[in-house]
Amino acid sequence: MFAVIKTGGRQFRVVPNDVLEIGKITGDVGTIVQLGEVMAVGGDTPVLGFPFIEGASVAAEILDHKRGPKVIAFKKRRRKNSKRKRGYRDEITVIRVTEILTDDKAPTIGPRAKKEKKVEAAPADGEAPAKKAPAKKAAAKKAAPKAAAKKAPAKKAAPKAKSE
């Protein structure tokens, strides 16, 4: 089953588990949002909306909020010494489509559980592995004073004799 949704002035064809980068929408990372502007639903019996399907929505989980790439708008009018450089970065929300809903149904799938970080098991003896001493840093500190050793004063040039 697929759906065509409209968000941020753009249209997307989505299926469950799709990951999309769309214009910024409000919500915290990990929450489920419903996108209500569904233009078409496909599957066994395709349905088209005029312009949207009543009661249909797409549930999606917010994965991240970030900024898009830099876009630079440079305008130059030749031979007039006139130019303008402006730039911007769009705010982007990364979402994962969880399910496509019809008939005003509520989302049944909640946000995914976060993966736990693997914790290294401590040795059974209770001894922690020994860490190497930072020998390179100590050597670098000793080398710096030697390099800044005594410096001979600069000699001045002798004045030139005038010829008559």
Curated annotation (Swiss-Prot):
Keywords assigned: Ribonucleoprotein, Ribosomal protein, RNA-binding, rRNA-binding
- Kindly list the residue ranges recorded as spanning the membrane: none
Q: Which SUPFAM superfamilies match?
A: L21p-like
Q: Name one Pfam family in it.
A: Ribosomal_L21p
Q: Spans of biased composition, class Basic residues?
A: 133-164
One annotated Gene Ontology cellular component of this protein: cytoplasm
Which residues lie within the region annotated Disordered? 105-164
Q: Name one GO molecular function term.
A: structural constituent of ribosome
Q: Name one GO biological process term.
A: translation
Per the entry, what this protein does is:
This protein binds to 23S rRNA in the presence of protein L20.
The similarity comment for this entry is: Belongs to the bacterial ribosomal protein bL21 family.
PANTHER family registered for this protein in UniProt: 50S RIBOSOMAL PROTEIN L21 (PTHR21349), LARGE RIBOSOMAL SUBUNIT PROTEIN BL21M (PTHR21349:SF0)
Self-association and partners: Part of the 50S ribosomal subunit. Contacts protein L20.
Q: This chain belongs to which protein, by name?
A: Large ribosomal subunit protein bL21
**Annotated source species:** Afipia carboxidovorans (strain ATCC 49405 / DSM 1227 / KCTC 32145 / OM5) (Oligotropha carboxidovorans)
What is this protein's gene name? rplU
